[in-house]
């Protein structure tokens, strides 16, 4: 399980370290993919990515919508590994997609991580926090 918010700066090669506590969970590699509907990068441990892929196979969504979802997730995904110092290099297409400049935020989101440009994250975090309580209240009503 991933949680917490971590701030980093990209080095001249577009790398940044991941928190030491989460590195063991990523020893088999991770998959980076564009956030669906959000300007961030999803980072899934390989085992979680495989679970996601399997769950999508059994979804009852219309075939045309499923093809679009598969394209959005899988065609733009990258299989990456941390280097010996625990650093992650962001692929250029994903950096561009998420608008990542120098400062990045890594946010733990249960079974995966999200990588955001710091400025974009600040506005998203505020919106998420405002809506979270409304969502919790709705869940409590049911």
From Swiss-Prot:
Its main location: cytoplasm. Pfam families: MraZ. SUPFAM superfamilies: AbrB/MazE/MraZ-like (SSF89447). The keyword 4Fe-4S does not apply. One of its GO terms (molecular function) is DNA-binding transcription factor activity. InterPro entries: MraZ, MraZ_C, MraZ_dom, MraZ_N, MraZ_sf, SpoVT-AbrB_dom, SpoVT-AbrB_sf. The keyword ATP-binding does not apply. One of its GO terms (biological process) is negative regulation of DNA-templated transcription initiation. Keywords: Cytoplasm, DNA-binding, Repeat, Transcription, Transcription regulation. Disulfide bonds: none annotated. One of its GO terms (cellular component) is nucleoid. Residues 5-48, 77-120 form the SpoVT-AbrB domain. It is found in: Cytoplasm, Nucleoid. Belongs to the MraZ family. Forms oligomers. PANTHER family: TRANSCRIPTIONAL REGULATOR MRAZ. This is Transcriptional regulator MraZ. The lineage of its organism: Bacteria, Bacillati, Chloroflexota, Dehalococcoidia, Dehalococcoidales.
């Amino acid at each position: 399980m991933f949680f917490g918010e971590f701030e980093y700066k990209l080095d001249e090669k577009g790398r940044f370290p991941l928190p030491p506590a989460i590195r063991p969970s990523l020893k088999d590699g991770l998959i980076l993919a564009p956030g669906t509907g959000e300007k961030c990068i999803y980072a899934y441990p390989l085992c979680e990515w495989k679970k996601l892929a399997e769950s999508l196979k059994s979804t009852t969504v219309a075939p045309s919508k499923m093809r679009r979802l598969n394209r959005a997730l899988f065609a733009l995904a990258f299989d990456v590994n941390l280097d010996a110092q625990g650093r992650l290099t962001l692929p250029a297409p994903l950096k561009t997609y998420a608008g990542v400049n120098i400062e990045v935020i890594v946010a733990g989101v249960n079974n995966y991580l999200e990588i955001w440009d710091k400025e974009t994250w600040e506005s998203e975090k505020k919106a998420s926090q405002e809506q979270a309580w409304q969502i919790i209240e709705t869940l409590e009503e049911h």
